[in-house]
Amino acid sequence: MKEIRSDMRELNGLVMGKMKERGLQCSSHPPSDWATGTGANFSGDVSFFERGPNEPIPTTFGDVLETDDGTGFGILSGDDLMLRLSTELEVTHCIFLIGDSDGIMTSPPGEKDSKLIPHFGPDTIISGKHDSDIDVTGGIGLKIDRSLEIAKIVEEVWIIDGRKPDRVVDLLASGETIGTKILSG
């Protein structure tokens, strides 16, 4: 547990370093410092993520947390954090960054005929299955479920390729980018 927590803080430090290089001031808020439990109903007050225009950008990430369910600890997914932050705070955009494709694909990214789905709604169908041996946090399925919930409240919900940071800039500047826009239905 300590090793995973340490690794997550190290990764967050790298992300914050890149943001600082771009002139952005950030503050780090590891969930293990302020939350308990897992899933969308984890315990923890997210109101301190509200900020004024001249205050540092608060950052957080998926983490190993203590639980009250008898297991002792569990993984709080960043997707569940996104759900709480997006639905409890005044949010204009919710952007999920993934690392293996341009956005949601018709089938797993490595498959021959897999194509980007530019708009994804509650009735959109994809193929594939989640491998919980590789990803214990829910994979793309949880990301899709949470993004659909968020889209009921937040108009601009996207899943895009995090390996291409200019796409975030394009989205914020023009309202469009290569990726998948999540529709409320």
Q: What spans do the regions from the language model cover?
A:
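C-terminal catalytic "cap/lid" subdomain
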Residues: 1-185
